[in-house]
Each structure stands twice: as C-alpha cells, then as structure tokens.
Amino acid sequence: MVREQYTTTTEGTHIQRPENQCVYKIGIYGWRKRCLYLFVLLLLIILLVNFALTIWILKVMWFSPTGMGHLRVTKDGLRLEGESEFLFPLYAKEIHSRVDSSLLLQSTQNVTVNARNSEGEVTGRLKVGPKMVEVQSQQFQINSKDGKPLFTVDEKEVVVGTDKLRVTGPEGALFEHSVETPLVRADPFQDLRLESPTRSLSMDAPKGVHIKAHAGKIEALSQMDIIFQSSDGMLVLDAETVCLPKLVQGTQGPAGSSQRLYEICVCPDGKLYLSVAGVGTTCHEHSHICL
C-alpha cells in the first residue's frame, strides 16, 4: 500500500488546505493469495516426494558409478554376476561365463536361441523344451575338441564320424531304409541279430560279404527256402564234418520206374557232382569233372 500526502500553504496566511490522501493497493489478496500459497506448497511436496523416490530407486537398484546391481559396465561389454532373469528377448553377439564356473540357461517353459541374417530372418534355431530338443538349420554338426566332425545331419544324409557307433537299447536300431557301413558286429559275448519282421533282408557289397563268429555259431533260420547261389564261382563248405540230419528217407518204388535217379560223388578236393545212378556206383565213370 502506498499512501501519498500533499500539504500546501500560502505565504502570509495561516489557512491550511484540507489534507489530500490517495491510497494505492499493489499485490494479491484474498482467495488468490491463498491459492498461490497452496500451489507453491503442493510443488514443494511433489519435489520432496520425487527426490525421496529417486533416492529409494537408486538404493534398491544398487546404482553405482560402475553399473547397476550385479550388472557392471566394462571396456569389454557388460558383466553380470549371480543369477539374472530376462523378461524379454536378449540380443547379444557373445555370451560366456566366468573362467571358474559354467554357463546356465534356465527357463520354466523353453530356451530358444535364434540366429538371424541381415534382413532379420531366422537362419538357425535351437529350442530346448520340457519334452524335446529341436534344431532348425540347414546342417547340424557336432565336433570334437580338436574340430573333428563326430555327427553331421543334413537333408541328404547322416554322417557319424566316430570310430564306432554303439546302440545299447533293448530293441536295437530300427532303419526304414538302407544302411551303408563297412562293419556290423555285436558286443563281446552278445548275439548279433539282423531282422526284418515283415519284409526281406538284403546285404550287398561289391567285393564280398563276410560273416564271422569267433566264439560261437551262425544260424540262418527261414520258414521258406534258404538259397545259396553263386553265378560265377562255387559254394564251398570248408568243415571236417558236413551233416544233413533231416534228409527225407526214400521209399521203394515200382519196378521199371522211368524216374531218373542220381548219386552224389565227391572229388579228392571236396568238389561235389552228380552221377546217374545205376545198379552199382557210377562215380568213377564221371570222375573226369575232378580233373
């Protein structure tokens, strides 16, 4: 409030003019002043609350000059100590654990690792789920510590690079198509069975098929015929004793039967040949085949 007072007198007279007072009011008064104070007080309260929340967040998140919590920012990248949980996809060029500990990736549902090209398309995927492990790629390969391929799979073939492939299941191995291998053998003192329940079983090799049993016997069982056929060579039974225990015994036929009979003859080197049967042996007459 400004108050101005003007008093004038005239020389030689004692008459005093009436006092002239002018009052000017400058400022905010009334409800406006109260609202202004209330607004300023509200701003101070909000400022204090924000400052307290900032201090609380810094304390809870363990912010420090080197990082946040277990997350440390180094010149080589980011370093996490302890267990970490990612709620959204993680994009990284390289992930490795400490020298003295292993790397563990764990999820309640599945763990998926994707490889993308420059256009963002998935070119390779590894998915570990609760019931299966799925690999989606053009080629899947497992190498040894020295870089040697141990197991390779693509659309055309499966290659096992180890010296030995061992199947320990009670039902063995089931192959729907052909198998190419230089050697098939069982474990020591175990039986080797090659079986085709509903179809035929064929073994082919350009330089021969060798079947050996060093400490046991070899059995070939068939409900129908067993045929041994050699187109250019011979069938050799190299044994001290050859037994045919279940040959059918012949019966006496009518006299003068025109049925032709043969006898089996043996050369000194073990070769067998047939000779027309007669009243006596005729092997000597046809022995020129042994020459």
Curated annotation (Swiss-Prot):
Disulfide bonds join 265-290, 267-283. Its main location: membrane. It holds the Pfam family Sarcoglycan_1. Keywords: Cell membrane, Cytoplasm, Cytoskeleton, Disulfide bond, Glycoprotein, Membrane, Signal-anchor, Transmembrane, Transmembrane helix. Disulfide bonds are present. Glycans are attached at residue 110. It is a single-pass type II membrane protein. Residues 59-291 are extracellular. The chain crosses the membrane at residues 38-58. InterPro entries: Sarcoglycan, Sarcoglycan_gamma/delta/zeta. One of its GO terms (cellular component) is sarcoglycan complex. It is found in: Cell membrane, Sarcolemma; Cytoplasm, Cytoskeleton. GO terms for biological process: cardiac muscle tissue development; heart contraction. Interacts with the syntrophin SNTA1. Cross-link to form 2 major subcomplexes: one consisting of SGCB, SGCD and SGCG and the other consisting of SGCB and SGCD. The association between SGCB and SGCG is particularly strong while SGCA is loosely associated with the other sarcoglycans. Interacts with FLNC. Belongs to the sarcoglycan beta/delta/gamma/zeta family. Component of the sarcoglycan complex, a subcomplex of the dystrophin-glycoprotein complex which forms a link between the F-actin cytoskeleton and the extracellular matrix. This is Gamma-sarcoglycan. It comes from Canis lupus familiaris.
